[in-house]
A protein has these predicted regions:
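Conserved active-site alpha-helix within GNAT-family acetyltransferase domains
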Residues: 134-150
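Conserved catalytic-core motifs of GNAT/GCN5-like acyltransferases
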Residues: 129, 147-164
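Conserved acetyl-CoA-binding loop-helix of GNAT-fold acetyltransferases
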Residues: 103-117, 139, 143
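A short, well-structured alpha-helix characteristic of acyl/acetyltransferase catalytic modules
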Residues: 1-52, 175-178
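Glycine-rich acetyl-CoA-binding "A-motif" of GNAT/NAT acetyltransferases
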Residues: 73-76, 136, 163
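A short, internal acetyl-CoA/4′-phosphopantetheine-binding micro-motif in the GNAT/acyltransferase core
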Residues: 95-103
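Conserved GNAT acetyl-CoA-binding A-motif
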Residues: 120-130
Length: 178
């Protein structure tokens, strides 16, 4: 299951490749384009935290981080997180897009591709965990057809010390496509 999830993906003008060292500088530069956004993320992929955060994501054998492309342009990143082969569940998260791609439909195309791959690989439940302060991401989850299951109060302490409430969304295999 995990091996299939880690394969490159492509479709609808976009693609996703598993993060490798050849992507480090380009992804770091893309993540630096919106330094203020990292305040509402659990981890800091801005210039002063990028290397530590990418190392943290890559350190878990249950995570797979992808570099995203719009055509030939490096567009951002997203990950399969906490892949649980026993429960057939995972989270899609750690998603960041360069500012000029937000609201362009890129998110929908990438998420469709990642969701389809997950379900085709045997996953039955996909979760999305969003800081309650992140209205844009919550709206995007609703557009995808994800069900808002509730709020995990004081769920985690983010990189900047904020005690975060997390909105939990999910999509089940038998609910997809919406």
């Amino acid at each position: 299951m995990i091996e299939q999830l880690a394969q490159p993906m492509a479709g609808d003008g976009c693609r996703a490749e598993l993060f490798g060292e050849q992507h480090r500088d380009g992804l770091r530069a893309a993540c630096a384009e919106d330094r203020n956004i990292w305040a509402i993320y659990a981890n800091n992929f801005g210039p002063d935290g990028f290397d530590d955060s990418i190392a943290l994501y890559r350190s878990s054998p249950r995570n797979r981080t992808f570099v995203l492309f719009e055509g030939h342009e490096l567009a951002g990143m997203s990950s399969y997180l906490t892949i649980d082969e026993g429960r057939h569940c995972l989270e899609i998260g750690g998603t960041y897009y360069r500012p000029h791609l937000r609201g362009s439909g890129f998110n929908r195309r990438i998420k469709n591709m990642m969701i389809e791959r997950a379900f085709d690989s045997g996953i039955r439940r996909i979760e999305f965990r969003v800081d309650v302060r992140n209205a844009r991401s919550q709206a995007a989850m609703k557009k995808l057809g994800a069900v808002r299951e509730g709020v995990l109060r004081a769920d985690r302490i983010t990189w900047n010390g904020h005690v975060r409430d997390t909105a939990l969304f999910s999509i089940l295999k038998d609910e997809w496509p919406v």
